[in-house]
Amino acid sequence: MITIKQYEQGKGGKFLILEKENPAGEMTYRWEGKDKLIINHTGVFEEYRGKDYGRKLIMKGIEYAKEKGVKIVPQCSYVKKVMERDELLKDMIFTE
């Protein structure tokens, strides 16, 4: 069983994915102004790779951004690739 927990601190935070209460990966973010959520890192620990945990973290981040009514700046190359390739996620990318 997996769970995703969110931790916020100041102008940033992270989502931590747990498998049987063991940390399996994380995605970090920071706020820029009130309309941009910058996702700057996504990583899944080696022994947990291949289980789609990175995408699960991204989807949790997108859900969070939607709740807050903001767009995402995908500084993390993996997040950018996933969002640009999925037509349903492209509209969540912040554009100037």
Ranges and model annotations:
Residues G13-A24:
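Conserved beta-hairpin
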Residues Y48, D52-L57:
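Conserved acetyl-CoA pyrophosphate-binding loop and the N-cap/start of the following alpha-helix
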Residues G61:
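Aromatic/hydrophobic pocket-lining residues that form π-stacking "cages" and hydrophobic walls in ligand
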